[in-house]
Amino acid sequence: MSEKAVVVYSGGMDSFTVLNTAIQNGLDVYALSFNYGQKHSKELEVAAHVCRKLGISHKVVDITAINSLMANSSLTGDAEIPEGHYEDDNMKSTVVPNRNMVLLSMAIAYAVSLEAGKVYYGAHSGDHHIYPDCRPEFVEAMNAVSKIANYQSVEIVTPFLHSSKGEILKAGLDMNLNYANTWTCYNGREKSCGKCGACYERLEAFAEQGKTDPLEYEA
């Protein structure tokens, strides 16, 4: 019987690669997505489609009821999504307060209920500058907490914590993954904007690998 693992799966290219990495590692994967009121909720539709195709368990948890407690982010509020490079300081407006701690806490609870020993999520080096809850010290602290918060110890696994977006893409391409089955743009429109930090980072990754992004862009 395969070991169970929960994968925090947004529908973006990082978590898509993590999801498939866990599957390739022979784990019995339970994908977990969250609706926290993000403008780019299209990612949840993509996540559901991928999980149906893979035939794996997928839960989408609606936590919009606590949205007012996680306010002041351009991803969930009225502020415009900033344009520019993903390491520019204006991208700090896309930080959702305490998001990954909240999401990982629920993922750990789900893992305990499943008797799963691992929770995977897609933190990577490109997020370290802007997002405190994607940094190595955060992962280390969450791992320490997850080992003592319940009778069952759960390990937080971040396969790409020290990898760039380009390196994540290379790992996925080596697995023959189709990145048309992902959504990255922070704007929730029909096509990717090509101007937000998330789009910039994605396009840089494809350029770094000498590949063309299969998604359509407005610009």
Curated annotation (Swiss-Prot):
Residues the record lists as binding ATP: Y9, S10, G11, G12, M13, D14, S15, F16, T17, V18, L19
Coiled coil: none
Co-factor binding details: Binds 1 zinc ion per subunit.
Pathway: Purine metabolism; 7-cyano-7-deazaguanine biosynthesis
Major enzyme class: ligase
Entry binding sites for Zn(2+): C185, C193, C196, C199
Pfam families per record: QueC
UniProt-recorded Gene Ontology molecular function terms: ATP binding; ligase activity, forming carbon-nitrogen bonds; zinc ion binding
Keywords: ATP-binding, Ligase, Metal-binding, Nucleotide-binding, Queuosine biosynthesis, Zinc
Cofactors required: Zn(2+)
GO terms of biological process kind: queuosine biosynthetic process
InterPro entries named in the record: QueC, Rossmann-like_a/b/a_fold
Gene3D superfamilies membership: HUPs
Reaction equations catalysed: 7-carboxy-7-deazaguanine + NH4(+) + ATP = 7-cyano-7-deazaguanine + ADP + phosphate + H2O + H(+)
EC number(s) given by UniProt: 6.3.4.20
Family named by the database record: Belongs to the QueC family.
Function, in words: Catalyzes the ATP-dependent conversion of 7-carboxy-7-deazaguanine (CDG) to 7-cyano-7-deazaguanine (preQ(0)).
NCBIfam families xrefs: 7-cyano-7-deazaguanine synthase QueC (TIGR00364)
Protein name: 7-cyano-7-deazaguanine synthase
Organism: Marinomonas sp. (strain MWYL1)
Recorded name of the encoding gene: queC
